Structures are given as C-alpha cells and as structure tokens.
C-alpha cells in the first residue's frame, strides 16, 4: 500500500499515523492509533479530511474527532508574518502561491514552536523565506495533486 492511502484510510476512521520504523525484513512499518479528542491536526491532514468528506468517505467515527476545518481557522502567527513581510518580494511571492501551500508550509514552521523546538522552527522559517524569495514551492503539500482538484 502507498503511504497516502494508509493515512487517508486512518483519517476516515478517526485514527492517526504515528511513528514509522524501517526494518530489513519488512521494509517499513507504520504505527496507527485512534486519534484523541482535541489532538493536534496538521493543515495537510485537515485538507485530506476535507477531501475525504467531499468524496463521502469519512465515517461517523472519523467525523467525531474532526477539528475546525474552516480554512479561516488557520492563522499565521506574528513572528512568521513579520519574517515573510520583511522583504516585499518574499511577501508578494508568498501571496501568489496557492492557499493550501501557504497553510501547509506555515503550519510546518509554526508547529515547531508548539512542540518547543526553537532550532527547528528557525531552520524551517529560514528555508521558507529562502525558497519563497526564489519563488520556489517545495515539499509535499498537495499529495501529488490529490488535494488540488477534488
């Protein structure tokens, strides 16, 4: 099975993908566990859930653990917004990128602060600014196109 298929199936039933381990015998194993109420959701998983709902694949169990899925619920925190606005070219390029890309990339930066990883936060913020000034999108943000047109 493909990783994305496993993640989507888990989301449909209110589960979340956790740690994965590599093994010579089995290749890769992925731990799946029931999602706790009020658990943290990445913007990427929120978009996956929106897609699964639209396709009629989300079960009642999956619906029970959903967070606020409105795109407006996502906010860019002030330090990140300041870093993006510092150079007008960065801010202009950033605003030309798709909304989903913006949310997924910024969430990846901001999540490091939530989990008390300041070095990782600084590294990710620097990478976002560097790639944005070059007008480059990077990383897995649309599940190879699955999340673009559904």
Provide a role label for each language-model segment.
Residues 1-150:
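Charge-dense, helix-prone N-terminal extensions
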